[in-house]
């Protein structure tokens, strides 16, 4: 049985909830959810991959259990979501990782990949709109 831990990371004062499973020394895969969902959407996928991958599935800002600041205090743009998730990967110690993007997670993940291509080992796109 796969153990999935639930954690929070403080990203520059912003609380990001995430699910984590798999061996820390395995290849890392960042799972970015769609709209209007959360990391909970990966509840069936994580156990299927956790024997081979280190999996981390955050709730994007404003979704799930992550902080949801007002629109007046936080710009809910894909650029800003990518900045928060990029910092999130730094805070939790990711150096290089693959990114799995789904739907709304695609513009976020693709922007992250464009900003830091040296950190991205692969991009897996599922039901994703075109372009960053």
Across the structure, where does each feature detected by a protein language model lie?
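Conserved hydrolase catalytic core segment
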Residues: 48, 52, 94-132
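N-terminal cap/lid segment of alpha/beta-hydrolase-fold proteins
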Residues: 1-15
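A structural signal for well-ordered alpha-helical scaffolds and beta->alpha junctions
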Residues: 2, 39-42, 78-82
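Short, hydrophobic alpha-helix immediately C-terminal to the catalytic nucleophile
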Residues: 43, 86, 110-114
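Active-site loop/oxyanion-hole signature of alpha/beta-hydrolase fold enzymes
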Residues: 9-12, 19, 57-102, 130-131
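Short, flexible active-site loop motifs that bind/organize anionic cofactors or intermediates
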Residues: 32, 71, 109
């Amino acid at each position: 049985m796969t153990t999935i831990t639930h954690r929070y990371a403080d990203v520059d004062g912003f609380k990001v909830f995430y699910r984590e499973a798999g061996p820390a020394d395995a290849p890392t895969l960042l799972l970015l959810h769609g709209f209007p969902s959360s990391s909970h959407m990966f509840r069936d996928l994580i156990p299927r991959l956790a024997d081979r991958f280190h999996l981390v599935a955050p709730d994007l800002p404003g979704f799930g259990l992550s902080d949801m600041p007002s629109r007046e205090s936080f710009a809910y743009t894909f650029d800003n979501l990518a900045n928060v998730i990029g910092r999130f990967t730094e805070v939790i110690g990711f150096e290089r990782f693959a990114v799995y993007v789904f739907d709304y997670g695609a513009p976020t993940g693709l922007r992250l990949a464009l900003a830091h291509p040296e950190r991205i080992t692969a991009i897996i796109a599922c039901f994703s709109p075109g372009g960053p």
